Amino acid sequence: MGRADAVLGEMHRAGIGRGDLLALVVAPRVGMALAWAHGSLSVPVADDDPAQVVGQLENALRPRWVVWTNDTATTLVDAGVRVATCWDVAAVNRLLFGGWRSDPASVWARLHDLPLETIPASGPLHLFNQPDPEEPDPDGALRADGHLRADWADGGWAANPGRIRRWAELAWSVHADQTLRLAELAERPRVATTA
């Protein structure tokens, strides 16, 4: 049984079917991860190309992929895989809040009512930019103040299979929060169909 068959079997056991939402993260040379309402999994790269596995899942299930940005779709297209439908977290952020700033840290901050000006900056550590010794999980995706950690938002999510799995779970969480926000837009009832 190939890797794609094993993942497909897991999706069937989870009840994922045609058109169901499924968060997807692809990290070349690391693997891929999926998340859904009641679970997640990470598929490390061995000999299998993550795009190949996604292509087989697309053909068998045709889910609506939840992706952080269109970079995921671009990676798949470059590998010869075309997906039919996506929930692009960055694009939905633009529908909800306007503007063009839709990087993961900004999306997360807006959905969690955190000030954009307090988004942590990335870059090398210096006198005024040191790790917080009070952080509950110094390797986790979230800081104690609720913001995404700068290293994660800047690509550190792709460091290993465990991190890509967590990044997929966060994409699912953002999608769920965006769905709630869209439902609150009574004055624009058609916006949810655009998302």
Residue ranges and their predicted role:
Residues T75, A84, R94, V107-R110, ...:
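Mixed-charge, glycine-rich, non-catalytic linkers/tails in nucleic-acid processing enzymes
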Residues M1-L111, P115:
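Conserved RNase H-like, two-metal-ion catalytic cores of nucleic-acid enzymes
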